[in-house]
Amino acid sequence: MGTDGDRAKAVDLAISQIERQFGKGSIMRLGAKERIEDIAVIPTGALSLDIALGIGGVPRGRIIEIFGPESGGKTTLALHIIAEAQKRNGLAAFIDAEHALDVSYARKIGVNTDDLLISQPDTGEQALEIAETLVRSGALDILVVDSVAALVPKAEIEGEMGDAQMGLQARLMSQALRKLTGSISKSNTTVIFINQLRMKIGVFFGNPETTTGGNALKFYASMRLDIRKSGSIKSGQDVIGMRTKVKVVKNKVAPPFRETEFDILFGEGISKAGDILDLAAESGIVEKSGAWYSYGGERIGQGRDNTRNFLKEHPDILVRIEEQVRSEHGLKPRLQEQEEPAK
């Protein structure tokens, strides 16, 4: 072996060769802080998650998988990403294979439902054909499929209730993703698959949880987000929301395995004010002394809930704090980000 300098040069040369051949972000140092500047993103609606993803949101022209237990916030997060894309004049589509989209809740989150393309397909094949046609059009910015578990193959629907249909859904997903992946990259469309968890039978060691639809989606996804409830948010005796934990279990464009937590309030979605308050307190932008929170030398609230409500009622202060948090974490200012075109 050569000297440390020779080895470092050899590694740098190998990295540059890999990046030329396979693209920027195909290899990186795990502790690297730098953002991959040329990756266009759509914010998630939760600033802490944008930071955890390493690039300020979900990347365009990639496949994303959001999975977790029931009522964990999967669809809520996907709807927030749609709302953020629409704020940037993006066109969004929602393939509702579960036939369960709550339109009034989507509106409360900020989705422009009048411009949202929606499809409620009868079979898995139909859902994925519609997805491919929309992606190939090149006009779409974001497509959400809710959910992989509800993409039932035609043969299973037409068969008898007790028929064994082994591996049909996995084969369907594998074939569809092979066709979709090239179109997604060319059209710069972000495709989000929402997925459910199942328990593997007979697993005594390791994690018994697995996602539906076989292994293809695990391989094709550039990001995989594990989202689940970590606690309840109460106002007196009433439960008004839930604390949600997201773990980035796969990330091809930034270092993976980062985690974050934020509040989801019922009927409102992700609490932007609560999320920014937590980040600001963590980095010292908002000072916390006992139960009191202070900003710019002035007290803004006693207790987290009161301070969160104060920030909701004073959006000008919230925007100032958000810009400081974004600057602290190397993200673009929000105004500059919103001025950029959708495509």
UniProtKB/Swiss-Prot annotation:
One of its GO terms (molecular function) is single-stranded DNA binding. It is found in: Cytoplasm. HAMAP family: RecA. One of its GO terms (cellular component) is cytosol. It comes from the Bacteria. It comes from Syntrophus aciditrophicus (strain SB). It holds the Pfam family RecA. This is Protein RecA. Keywords: ATP-binding, Cytoplasm, DNA damage, DNA recombination, DNA repair, DNA-binding, Nucleotide-binding, SOS response. The gene is recA. ATP binds at residues 68-75. Can catalyze the hydrolysis of ATP in the presence of single-stranded DNA, the ATP-dependent uptake of single-stranded DNA by duplex DNA, and the ATP-dependent hybridization of homologous single-stranded DNAs. It interacts with LexA causing its activation and leading to its autocatalytic cleavage. Belongs to the RecA family. One of its GO terms (biological process) is SOS response.
